């Protein structure tokens, strides 16, 4: 899990760095107080959640921070002077992203008291948030200020705490309700193979964690006469346009963010808009894309499963499906649909994947024809086209 801490005074970050020092699965990220650095952290590091201090929200940097938060779909943890009356400052417009509020007094305790009485609870809540980036599905929770009365005792220790003991020992306003992991049916219902015409090849690609760099390696082999490519890279809305523009400046092919109705042609690469699901369809001799709003699918929007299902239905054996590095299982189920409808499917191997989640899940269910290292995938795609 990657936690981005934005704290103008540095106290909160120090606490979390020390608190998670023995957790090998947790990385504390820092973006400083530069807007460009902040955007780069989201594009390159893919944090699972963001922690913001109230003083930071009320500072001059708060405006830049608010602009970024409006374009991401990650849960925010807010450190407030008063957890019942938080002052969101410049973040007032994006306060709906805040899903956990912690009283700042917790961080002013001695290290021993903090670790024994509050750290286990806070760590549990952060890990729950980090595992489930469904911000619309959370009820706001508040961790109250410590009890400094003379009768208060520290009885619990971090190493013997579990979910039930924590929930019984502390007053937390609500229980987190996780939204279901939506099936692609909520966006596009599977109707079998709709288009049975033989056409030129189209390439559909899904990627997530580590995908921004993987796509750069994948795309460098393609030319102006290469088959059209449609890509879903898990990335917040607002960032996909600049990502596509940067790629377009790097390669000798046309790369753009998807717009509704874009017609596919050789040498064109379409990057899914981070705010919409993307599907490919076929009509009157042309493949084209549509942007669809709606709920998260496989915990993502855009979802690889949505794109792959549309390719299974409208392209069939005319499609080549590629699943690259990424966490989770988005894309696996509908890559199998593609394969069953005649598409050729490829997965990145474990050795070259930053996270071998999405490719592994596709391989496990028999959705993959070929497993290849990243450096060989593009050439193999071109040979099959």
UniProtKB/Swiss-Prot annotation:
Coiled coil: none
Main location (coarse class): cytoplasm
Catalytic activity annotation: [protein]-L-glutamate 5-O-methyl ester + H2O = L-glutamyl-[protein] + methanol + H(+); L-glutaminyl-[protein] + H2O = L-glutamyl-[protein] + NH4(+)
SUPFAM superfamilies given in the database record: Methylesterase CheB, C-terminal domain (SSF52738)
Any one of the GO BP annotations: chemotaxis
Gene3D superfamilies according to UniProt: Methylesterase CheB, C-terminal domain
Keywords: Chemotaxis, Cytoplasm, Hydrolase, Phosphoprotein
CDD domains: CheB_Rec (cd16432)
Record-given protein name: Protein-glutamate methylesterase/protein-glutamine glutaminase
């Amino acid at each position: 899990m990657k936690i981005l801490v934005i704290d103008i005074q540095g106290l909160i970050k120090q606490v979390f760095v020390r608190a998670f020092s023995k957790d090998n699965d947790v990385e504390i990220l820092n973006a400083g107080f530069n807007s460009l650095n902040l955007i780069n952290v989201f594009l390159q590091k893919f944090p699972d959640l963001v922690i913001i201090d109230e003083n930071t929200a009320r500072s001059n940097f708060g405006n830049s921070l608010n602009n970024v938060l409006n374009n991401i779909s990650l849960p925010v943890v807010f450190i407030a002077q008063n957890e019942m009356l938080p002052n969101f400052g410049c973040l007032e417009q994006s306060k709906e992203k805040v899903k956990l509020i912690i009283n700042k007094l917790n961080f002013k305790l001695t290290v021993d008291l903090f670790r024994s009485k509050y750290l286990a609870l806070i760590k549990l809540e952060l890990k729950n948030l980090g595992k489930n980036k469904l911000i619309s599905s959370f009820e706001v929770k508040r961790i109250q200020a410590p009890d400094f009365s003379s009768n208060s005792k520290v009885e619990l220790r971090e190493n013997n705490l579990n979910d039930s003991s924590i929930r019984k020992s502390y007053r937390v306003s609500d229980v987190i309700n996780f939204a279901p992991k939506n099936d692609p049916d909520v966006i596009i219902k599977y109707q079998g193979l709709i288009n049975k015409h033989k056409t030129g090849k189209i390439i559909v690609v899904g990627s997530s964690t580590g995908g921004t760099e993987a796509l750069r390696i994948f795309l460098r082999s393609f030319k102006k006469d290469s088959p059209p490519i449609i890509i879903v890279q898990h990335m917040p809305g607002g960032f996909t346009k600049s990502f596509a523009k940067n790629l377009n400046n790097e390669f000798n092919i046309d790369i753009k963010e998807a717009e509704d109705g874009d017609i596919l042609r050789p040498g064109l690469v379409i990057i899914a808009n981070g705010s919409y699901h993307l599907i490919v369809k076929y009509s009157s001799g042309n493949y084209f894309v549509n942007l669809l709003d709606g709920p998260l699918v496989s915990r993502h929007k855009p979802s690889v499963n949505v794109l792959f299902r549309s390719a299974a239905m409208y392209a069939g054996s005319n499609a080549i499906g590629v699943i690259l590095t990424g966490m989770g299982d988005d894309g696996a189920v509908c890559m199998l649909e593609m394969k069953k409808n005649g598409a050729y499917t490829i997965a990145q191997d474990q050795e070259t994947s930053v996270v071998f989640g999405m490719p592994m899940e596709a391989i496990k269910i028999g959705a993959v024809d070929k497993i290849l290292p990243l450096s060989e995938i593009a050439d193999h795609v071109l040979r099959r086209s």
